[in-house]
């Protein structure tokens, strides 16, 4: 659902109809951001007849730097990301659209051969992206320790590699890295912002 529709063809962007546009967001594969970006491409860019591709990055800040390089580069950021507030303030960025796309299911994932017990939450370190960590508080009532990483997919990968035993991650990353959910929480209702290059250079 598009809440704000300032079509990405506006403000001198009519060339995007014939050229390839890039939608940037947080990677690696398996992130909720990738899921939302694919949703956006399927439900907006393709319906508008736009040629588009998806590009995944290590941080949202890296996505923004790419967006600032070209009017054909865009960035999708979830409103749960704390750093999004800085993007709204930048004169060289513009907010183009806001849309809703709920995340995949979130839960605690382990390797298939790992024997999980509930009391491990009192002592183990859970690897997670910062944004969803309150799921642990609300669903388990536990005060756990976290190792914070850049994405939910990266959290799952670290468990797959044996660096940690428990990840707070989503269903896509769980499948990608062959993990098993020992607890499931919820699909998070989420809204997202689409940013494009601003017109600050044209005004100066």
UniProtKB/Swiss-Prot annotation:
It comes from Bacillus subtilis (strain 168). The keyword Plastid does not apply. Pathway: Antibiotic biosynthesis; bacilysin biosynthesis. It is found in: Cytoplasm. GO terms for biological process: antibiotic biosynthetic process. The gene is bacA. Belongs to the prephenate decarboxylase family. This is Prephenate decarboxylase. Its EC number is 4.1.1.100. It catalyses: prephenate + H(+) = 3-[(4R)-4-hydroxycyclohexa-1,5-dien-1-yl]-2-oxopropanoate + CO2. Part of the bacABCDEF operon responsible for the biosynthesis of the nonribosomally synthesized dipeptide antibiotic bacilysin, composed of L-alanine and L-anticapsin. Bacilysin is an irreversible inactivator of the glutaminase domain of glucosamine synthetase. BacA is an unusual prephenate decarboxylase that avoids the typical aromatization of the cyclohexadienol ring of prephenate.
């Amino acid at each position: 659902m598009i809440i704000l529709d300032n079509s990405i063809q506006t403000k001198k962007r009519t060339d995007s109809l014939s050229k390839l546009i890039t939608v940037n967001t947080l990677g690696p594969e398996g992130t909720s951001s990738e899921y939302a970006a694919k949703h956006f491409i399927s439900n907006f860019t393709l319906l508008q007849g736009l040629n588009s591709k998806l590009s995944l990055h290590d941080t949202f800040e890296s996505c923004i730097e790419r967006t600032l390089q070209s009017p054909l580069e865009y960035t999708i950021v979830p409103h749960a990301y704390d750093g999004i507030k800085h993007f709204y303030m930048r004169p060289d960025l513009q907010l183009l659209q806001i849309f809703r796309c709920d995340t995949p299911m979130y839960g605690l994932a382990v390797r298939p051969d790992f024997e999980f017990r509930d009391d491990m939450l009192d002592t183990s370190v859970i690897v997670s992206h910062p944004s969803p960590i309150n799921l642990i508080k609300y669903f388990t009532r536990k005060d756990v320790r976290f190792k914070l990483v850049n994405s939910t997919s990266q959290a799952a990968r670290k468990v797959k590699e044996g660096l940690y035993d428990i990840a707070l991650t989503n269903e896509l990353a769980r499948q990608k890295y062959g993990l098993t959910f020992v607890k499931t929480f919820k699909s998070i209702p989420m809204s997202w912002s689409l940013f494009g290059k601003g017109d600050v250079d044209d005004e100066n």
